[in-house]
Amino acid sequence: MVESEHGEALEDTERLQGRGALVNNVKAASALAGAIRSTLGPKGLNKMLVEADGSSIVTNDGVTVLENANVEHPTAKMLIQASSSQDRAARDGTTTTIILASEMLQNAMELVSMGVHPSVIVNGYSIALSEAIEEAKRIARAPGKTGMGLAVRTALEGKGDTRTCDFFAKLAMGAAERLAQEGGGEDFERLRVKRIQVSEGEILDSELVDGLILPKSRVDIHMPDSINGGLVAILDGELEQRSLEISASIEIDSPGALSAFHEKKIENLRSQIGHLAKLGVDLLVVRDGIADEAINMLTSHGITAYRRFERPDLELLSVITGAKISRNIMEISPNDLGDFSNHFERRISDVKHTIIEGSKGTGMTVIVRGTSKTIREEGIRIFDDGLGVAHRLIRNPDVLPGGGASYAHLSRYLRSFALSCANREQLAIEAFASALESIPRVLAEN
């Protein structure tokens, strides 16, 4: 009875076991590595990814290719997750991760065919990994400022033409140096730098600007468009009379009743804006809308206001100015206000943009230019990779020789170390060393 129920439950399930399952998993890893192998190296090729809706992405970035690929095999999905983890940790080495994992699986498959138990292979790989990490630490060197710049440039090799990679390496290094004093966590550099795209100009006309830049203009042209320092308030909500959230009807029994409702609305707005004026607010940023009646009141009090900000922009503005994000204007206190050092509007590609420079924290905006969306998006990816590497390099200034030299050295070191192991783990350590040699081979091909 139990066997019958299990049979019905697995009726539509394909089950692989034994050698067949191992071969299937290794083939999936090899296919994934083969799809991105040609992107690695100074002459690596770009990939064009075409979505179901016809849109396309042209990129040399391994993790971008993998995350946009339509993959069903569970082993391939696991490798893509490993590549994404590598990207979050180091902002580089995503393609290398897949190639190494694929080679290690193929070498492990050969050992299994020779009769080596998988647990022995896992133990041998673990020993080899620990030894490789210790040896890598031993041969690492502090690069100095010039060496850091060269390391960032090396990380971008093959992601674009020489001039583009040189340009974004310098831009990324400059941004990382400005952020260096504040430390930060894993995604610190991504959160502190906003990215905007502009169709006017070439990619080499891109620029890094201090402060938060948004394609916004003040809600009234009579409001000050340039303020040299002041107080800012951030409202996560709206500055208008909210509609009732329940179904209700109101009976008007006198000619002045409707007017009284309107006057009450105006009185509430006047009270809120008066509260801001008493606090000395110079700049008001609102996530949602601002009522037309409120605009005139803000103008009369000399408060410059902006509306319809995205949540990430509010958070970055909060960081660089020290302002707390409030949900109720009447509850804003002096301690909730932030300081900005400069505010002005600038026309970029015939569109007015607002620039707010904070005085509490470092925040920047990179303006990536290009004639097509594909070029601009790839420029942003190149900058992001360079910034991630530069930020981590400043925090942990150790580098290894490039061009596959470090992998070749570690491979030789592990082969020598394996001779000191008297058990069957020696075979797995040698297989690990052989897998490391795949990177110099691919670089020689590309």
Provide a role label for each language-model segment.
Residues 1-446:
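Core, soluble structural subunits of large cytosolic macromolecular machines
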